[in-house]
């Protein structure tokens, strides 16, 4: 199966910018366009619908929505809307969500909550009126969407790092995304974690695609690109660094980076991140350096590499360099 290359966009841009970036990405040959679902940014459906109208080939989806801040029936509706607007190119990305404590949202029973949300979403898309009674969510018998959908079964991606989340993906998902990682050593770890769930469901673990995506900054000035990547990755490091069992972090690095980020000093936080750590959690440098990082993931069997925001010293420059100078270097 051909490896896909995608772009991950942050939803912080003016109207019109998403369409322009999406058209450029499709022309360059990217396969998938993802919009993040990070707290307090624009809802992903806005940029996704704009990009759907501007493209005709690429797959589109949010990575990820969460069933704590958005009810499953609303997730089903937004997925159906995107699939209609894109004529069948949408996928659903679901995860437990991050930073929701800032808005007072507890996240109990995440595995059950995600699995039942998936049940509700796909029952609604299939037109199943039989009802559903779960431990977290339910549908009364007869409850159904009041419009025709494009497809009853858009692909499902789950965002997860840990053994239990990956096992759930192995049972029910088409893809698993390890967000915030550019580390090829995580791929066999995730594959084994998927295997436990896949075997339980009678599935081949190879049927579940592994997606790795991370902050990306590419430029012909490699040092400037890596400096910007350090600043960008600092806010995510405290979230994901301790989830990677293959990386040994310098003493107190995550704590010190987190304290500086909390104080609004992202550049100072980024300067603490050494090269070897940066390369595990971001794609950065010259086109040749970024291509080498992506190729390392392809060589260990990922289904998709996702180059995340901000792409370059500017979005437009980054997307252009990724398409014109990185994609041609990849063997897939």
Where are these regions (language model features)?
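Active-site-adjacent structural elements that line small-molecule/cofactor binding pockets in enzymes
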Residues: 1-332
